[in-house]
């Protein structure tokens, strides 16, 4: 299980990403449309002034059950270990052990 502080930090980052997503998107659109170099530089500065943790690339996918950051499967939102345990117990509908 991941440290609770790390899990809480990720939750805080997700909230910041949601909060600034619209503003970041608008600034990027303006940046792409801008033709003047000075205008582009100013828009770039405005983007840089946004909180660092409001960038979507700062968010790490974590298992919602254990908080494990590695071995994460997006389809389930779980780590590989939890998927294996839950599949063996029959808690994931439609998931069967492969055999060939």
From Swiss-Prot:
PROSITE patterns tied to this protein: RIBOSOMAL_S14
Gene3D superfamilies: 1.10.287.1480
GO MF assignments: rRNA binding; structural constituent of ribosome
UniProt KW keywords: Ribonucleoprotein, Ribosomal protein, RNA-binding, rRNA-binding
Gene Ontology, cellular component aspect: cytoplasm; small ribosomal subunit
HAMAP family: Ribosomal_uS14_1
Subunit-structure text: Part of the 30S ribosomal subunit. Contacts proteins S3 and S10.
Record protein name field: Small ribosomal subunit protein uS14
Organism ancestry: Bacteria, Bacillati, Cyanobacteriota, Cyanophyceae, Oscillatoriophycideae
Gene giving rise to this polypeptide: rpsN
């Amino acid at each position: 299980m991941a440290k609770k502080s790390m899990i809480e930090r990720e939750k805080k980052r997700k909230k910041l990403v949601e909060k600034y997503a619209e503003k970041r998107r608008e600034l990027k659109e303006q940046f792409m449309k801008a033709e003047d170099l000075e205008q582009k530089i100013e828009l770039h500065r405005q983007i840089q002034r946004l909180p660092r943790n409001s960038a979507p690339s700062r968010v790490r996918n974590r298992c919602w059950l254990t908080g494990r950051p590695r071995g994460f499967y997006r389809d389930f939102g779980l780590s590989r270990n939890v998927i294996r345990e839950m599949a063996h117990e029959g808690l994931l509908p439609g998931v069967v052990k492969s055999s060939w």
